[in-house]
Amino acid sequence: MGRIGFKVSKESVETISRISKLPNIKMEGMFTHFAKADEFDKSYTFAQHEKFLWMKEQLEKNGVQISYYDCDNSAGIIDFPDMKHDLARAGISIYGMYPSDEVKKDAVDLKPALELISHISFVKDVEKGTSISYGGTFE
């Protein structure tokens, strides 16, 4: 997703290897986030996982010891059981919802974990142009 972390490259492997040798440094985990696992086309996710495995292998070859590896989000847990590692980060599926209509819903039978119920407490008419809500968000 390009948010944080290192690029998949030999230079990154060298940098991480140097960092791992610093005093008082313990590499706890390495992770990625399957950016498109919830889409019908799974090619991006397969390619992303291959890059992840390449980095893992290169770091291990360089003697970098990492305790935990993690790729899975909700869609990854559902659609990619063969790509699991040490940890998984279930997001929306914790609440019993599928991440999209493009995942294999028959693979995991999710049950809603909560329900949002609301009641109308007050109705009033206001003149056009009246500022409503925090910061006058609505007019």
Please annotate each region the language model reported.
Residues V108-D109, T137-E139:
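Short proline/glycine-enriched turn/loop segments at secondary-structure junctions
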Residues M1-H119, V123-E127:
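Active-site loop/helix belt of alpha/beta enzymes
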Residues K128-T137:
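Short, solvent-exposed secondary-structure boundary/capping segments
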